[in-house]
Amino acid sequence: MARKTLRARRFFSLIFPFFFITSVYAEQTPESAKTVTVEAKNETFAPQHPDQYQSWKATSEQSAREDALAEDPRLVILWAGYPFSRDYNKPRGHAYAVTDVRETLRTGAPKTAEDGPLPMACWSCKSPDVARLIQQEGEDGYFHGKWARGGPEIVNDLGCADCHNTASDDFAQGKPALTLSRPYAERAMEAIGKPFDKAGRFDQQSMVCGQCHVEYYFDGKNKAVKFPWDEGMKVENMEQYYDTIAFSDWTNSLSKTPMLKAQHPEYETWSAGIHGRNNVTCIDCHMPKVQNAEGKLYTDHKIGNPFDNFAQTCANCHTQDKASLQKVVAERKQAIHDLKIKVEDQLVHAHFEAKAAWDAGATDAEMKPILNDIRHAQWRWDLAIASHGIHMHAPEEGLRMLGSAMDKAADARTKLARLLATKGITHEIPLPDISTKEKAQKAIGLNMQQINAEKQDFLKTVVPQWEDQARKNGLLSQ
């Protein structure tokens, strides 16, 4: 019965055009459409399509900041030596995409366009201005340089032109005109046998989200974004790919392990779960069709929790009531959280024990297999926990990855115990007090007072200059 209901609703959705956002552009020939500059100002599309625009704008209501490091100080140790040890908040609404990347301590406090710790690539999932710059400068031109170079250019929050070809005839006629606005995402989909232009509508819906909600790394001297899917999308496939090219995001400052940092692999984990395998898309659950005050259907662009629109999302397929499904999801979330903490405890000990081994005179040859185990354990843990919705998208895969991470961490600690014994160290390696974020940051040598002061100065002096320049150049509304 549930499957028939889903088919009926999907057939219904085919009858009515996808009311995403239609174009303000006049009708164009295919040739002229190719040369139209990407329009990054989202409010441009508001007059003709107020429902979609207002629902997108309502992502600003998702304003709460949740400090993941304060909630779980172990993370500071696992990311010692990496900017994530300074600052890591859980995600919030798309309307804060640009604000949050400016304000995070991870992007530093650059004074000039050539200053700062991070590359231009760190803008790549934040704004339709990225698509505009890639169109204007080419990929190599866009990726060239430091993150601060993009400050006066990337000023509009993630929105219309990130997902829709707003200059196309289809879009002007009210069709969704979905597009992959990032060429590197298009290449990645082709690498896994999913060329976008040959994909069906439902596949395209999730592929558009998969431009950003994926694992990626910065490749080559230009630090260009690349998805590590050449060997496949499972955690072991990506691990093998990274190992083969000898890639690491950073070296943990305690254990000296060459580490991998997972990003937000929702597309990969969704693909591995029951929803992905049955082609229930991101849109089905997070952007359902809803009615406006006049009873007209439109796609809700306030991307959020499916339970907030239960009748339009979960109830399309499931016969259980909302409370029953919430109970199931909560149990899965708790199971993943419990195993996550156990793995983190093992990894924290492993990093400090590895430091003790180095301090005791361990050699590179002695440490290599141990560091490899730590690298693989933390990578598998990170890919599981960096996908914030894994308890819903693929709980079985999440538990499998965490179980594998636990095994690898145990292997590392067993080898460390044996190695330390050869150095005359048989007692347990004590841990410093890492019971709070502040204490953990102090334990790895971070001067947070200075880091925060520099950031505040940057926000007060540099960011206003960026915005003034953007307005003068017509990139921001006055």
Curated annotation (Swiss-Prot):
E.C. numbers: 1.7.2.2
Cofactor annotation: Ca(2+); heme c
Cofactor comment: Binds 1 Ca(2+) ion per monomer. Binds 5 heme c groups covalently per monomer.
Binding site for heme c 5: 275, 314, 317-318
Residue numbers binding substrate: 216, 264
Residues the record lists as binding heme: 122, 125-126
InterPro entries, A to Z: Cyt_c552, Cyt_c_NO2Rdtase_formate-dep, Multihaem_cyt_sf
Binding positions for heme c 4 per the UniProt entry: 282, 285-286, 393
Residue sites binding heme c 2 per the record: 160, 163-164, 301
Molecular-function annotations in GO: calcium ion binding; heme binding; iron ion binding; nitrite reductase (cytochrome, ammonia-forming) activity
Pfam families documented for this protein: Cytochrom_C552
Record PROSITE patterns: MULTIHEME_CYTC (PS51008)
Binding site for heme c 3: 94, 209, 212-213
Annotated Ca(2+) binding sites: 215-216, 261, 263
Principal location class: periplasm
Alphabetized UniProt keyword annotations: Calcium, Electron transport, Heme, Iron, Metal-binding, Oxidoreductase, Periplasm, Signal, Transport
SUPFAM superfamilies from the UniProt entry: Multiheme cytochromes
Pathway linked to the protein: Nitrogen metabolism; nitrate reduction (assimilation)
GO-annotated biological processes: anaerobic electron transport chain; nitrate assimilation
Catalytic activity line of the entry: 6 Fe(III)-[cytochrome c] + NH4(+) + 2 H2O = 6 Fe(II)-[cytochrome c] + nitrite + 8 H(+)
Signal peptide as annotated in the record: 1-26
Stated role: Catalyzes the reduction of nitrite to ammonia, consuming six electrons in the process.
The family this protein is said to belong to: Belongs to the cytochrome c-552 family.
Protein name: Cytochrome c-552
Organism: Salmonella agona (strain SL483)
Gene responsible for this protein: nrfA
